[in-house]
Every structure is written in C-alpha cells, then in structure tokens.
Amino acid sequence: MANERIVYFAHGQESGPWGTKIKRLAQVAENLNFRVVSPDYSGFKSGYGRVEKLLSLQPSAAEQIILVGSSMGSWVSLCASEKLKPQGLFLLASAVGLENLEPNSPRPFAEKTLLVHGWDDEVVPVENAINFARNYQVPLHLLPADHRLITQLDSVANIFQNFLQQCLESKKDADPRSQWEKEQEAKFQKETINQIQPRIPR
C-alpha cells in the first residue's frame, strides 16, 4: 500500500530472520506504527541472491521504507538501496571493507544512514566501519561489544528508536508538492514581483 511505513530487516549470514536483535528492534518499529518485514535469506549462499529477493518484495510500493541490516544483511541493504532509495539505512556490525564481498563497500543511497558497530568486533574490524563512515560522511555509533552486539542491545534499541523518530520528523517536514507545483509557484511569484516593481523613469 502506498501509504504504508515499512521496516525491512536483513539478517546476517549465520543467523535467521527472527533472531534476538531483530525481535527487539521489531518491537521498537511497531511501537512507532511501522510494519515489519523480515525475510528468510538462509537459503541463499550468494549475497546477490539476497539482494534480488529483497528487491522482489517490491518495497518501493510503500510510502516510507527503512532498511535495517545486520552483518551480511547490512551489505544486502546497502546494495538494495541504490534501486530503492529508502528514507533510512540502519546498519549493524556492517560487513563492509571485506575482500570476499564485491563491491566491498557499497555506497549508501538513503536520506539518512547510520552505522552501529562494536569496538571488539571479531568478524568485521572496527577500522572498516570507521573508514566507511569517514568515506561516506555518515554517523557511526561505536559500542563496547563484539560482532553480535547483544550485550549492548538496550543501547542499540534506543539508537534505533531515535533514528526512526528522526526519519518520521524528516518525512513530516518534507514538502509534499510535486516539482511541477513548485515550479508554478516560483513562476507566479516572479511574475507578481515584476508587476509590483516600480518602473524607473528614463
């Protein structure tokens, strides 16, 4: 439905669609009246297969899309963002800067992007997240946790809630008019100014 707000979760390579983090963050999203979709990507060995599955769900039909990814799921969300142009990208323990993924640091295509990473991540070095955040000028939250971030789940949930609220405020403040309407108003204002502008005698 065109008026829906939907959060799409993408789980990690070794986890499932309703792991501990996703369950907790899904509650946060539902409390803010987002519908939650968490596909099962466990049958896909290829990251590209996961991206294609996400795109096949036609998320662009929703009014407001937030993509949330964990580990490999962050890479999937980043790759899908180029076509979907979501309002938000919320990336946990992102699989970026890894040699076995191509592209290894996909560009984020979203109005708002935020990374959360553990200082003690044993799978994706924290330097990878820092470099990604620096290269694409996106905010990064570093927490005292490992790759799973479970020990900091309360903090992750609070960060996610603030992120969704910012996305909602951004949507509320957006100008709902079409480009044609904006151009017509600008044209009208220009003509009005020209009409009331006093003529300078020669």
Roles of regions detected by a PLM:
Residues 134-150:
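Catalytic histidine neighborhood in serine/cysteine hydrolases
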Residues 109, 114-117, 121:
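Short beta-strand/loop motif that positions the catalytic acidic residue
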Residues 18, 122-128:
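Conserved alpha/beta-hydrolase "acid-adjacent" motif
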Residues 85-97:
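A conserved short beta-strand
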Residues 68-77:
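Gly/Ala-rich beta-loop-alpha elbow adjacent to hydrolase catalytic centers
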Residues 13, 119-121, 145-146:
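Acidic beta-to-alpha connecting loop that harbors the catalytic carboxylate
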Residues 2-44, 196:
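Short, surface-exposed "cap/lid" segments of acyl-processing enzymes
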Residues 150-166:
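Post-His helix in hydrolase/transferase enzymes
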